[in-house]
């Protein structure tokens, strides 16, 4: 019997599904193929791993590094055994095949291209009806029923669960990327189902309380931290001073054109490599090696650093990160195959004297900077504050290697490859 191209594409897609459970690579998203899959309007039933963490949470150097990789939670009670897990896998396979068999050949090819590229290549949107009838396809076992009886499934959620994060349970755990046609649209008739046009959301382990007007002293450079160089020194003249209050004219990045909303500096240990990169477009890819890459290519910068560790980390940057300015702030999406580490004044408790370093796994997004919170952290009437650079509009990002209290590196200037992102006022 001859096999059609469509059936071959379906089998190839199923073989490309994300591994689950113990087979999963670190940071890729796991937790087994079973479990409930709720639609957009269903109640949130996220399962959290041991230690109070969850698959969508961001680990930090002072807390538990909760991984979206290893599936420590169990969709079924342990007493259910392998039989229940196998049944859930069979249900998922039957449902996925019933969906894929309804797609046109061109749609299958587009989906396969996105899945096999793992997000490294820009792929088109896969526009499909957003919801799917919950009844299983003809390949389902006799009498098989879904684990939960919602009226319909979210199709983007199903494809993300199959091809990216097997432990995914609810639409509130993912965020659509701004490059997608469905970004910002509410309940469109057709929605993009390309699994690499969505990212997994990082949740802080404990949300910060309301921000006070006159908060923390740790935003000032301190004499007892010689390696914690303030941003004005690190970026060669970039300065943030706020004498007498807040205004656009007082928060300057560099003289001249103010059309850019941030500048990016790339560092290898204590040495800045290349020039400052001014960002004007709403979205910027920062990468070392990216097929069809368009943005800030770190691989093209001339570096004299011969350290084996620096060269090793540099080779792991790969697709890097995506920096996006959106309505609610600035988001960072980890496109690489390794974790990144982020420190930002707007991510943490303003009453703390130490900023946490947040670990962001591959495929995850985090809102790294919030303009309104940054404004509230300034002290315009503080005479001492007026005399020193203020670093609240700066975010630091390290590739692969972390720093802070739980690491041998106490300061980011000891990290092999890292970025300093300095934001303009809007």
Swiss-Prot record:
GO terms for molecular function: activin receptor binding; beta-catenin binding; collagen binding; I-SMAD binding; metal ion binding; transcription corepressor activity; transcription regulator inhibitor activity; type I transforming growth factor beta receptor binding. Residues 261-426 form the MH2 domain. Phosphorylation on Ser-249 does not affect its stability, nuclear localization or inhibitory function in TGFB signaling; however it affects its ability to regulate transcription. Phosphorylated by PDPK1. Its main location: nucleus. The keyword Lipid metabolism does not apply. Residues 13-55 are annotated as: Disordered. Keywords: Acetylation, Cytoplasm, Isopeptide bond, Metal-binding, Nucleus, Phosphoprotein, Transcription, Transcription regulation, Ubl conjugation, Zinc. Disulfide bonds: none annotated. Residues 37-47 have a biased composition (Basic and acidic residues). Zn(2+) binds at residues 125, 180, 192, 197. GO terms for biological process: adherens junction assembly; anatomical structure morphogenesis; artery morphogenesis; beta-catenin destruction complex disassembly; cell differentiation; cellular response to leukemia inhibitory factor; negative regulation of activin receptor signaling pathway; negative regulation of BMP signaling pathway. CDD domains: MH1_SMAD_7 (cd10494), MH2_SMAD_7 (cd10500). The modification N6-acetyllysine is found at residues 64, 70. Pfam families: MH1, MH2. Changing residue 64 to A: Loss of acetylation, and of SMURF1-dependent degradation. The keyword Ribonucleoprotein does not apply. Induction: By TGFB1. Interacts with WWP1. Interacts with COPS5. Interacts with NEDD4L. Interacts with STAMBP. Interacts with RNF111, AXIN1 and AXIN2. Interacts with PPP1R15A. Interacts (via MH2 domain) with EP300. Interacts with ACVR1B, SMURF1, SMURF2 and TGFBR1; SMAD7 recruits SMURF1 and SMURF2 to the TGF-beta receptor and regulates its degradation. Interacts with PDPK1 (via PH domain). Interacts with TSC22D1/TSC-22; the interaction requires TGF-beta and the interaction is inhibited by TGFBR1. PANTHER family: MOTHERS AGAINST DECAPENTAPLEGIC HOMOLOG 7, SMAD. Belongs to the dwarfin/SMAD family. This is Mothers against decapentaplegic homolog 7.
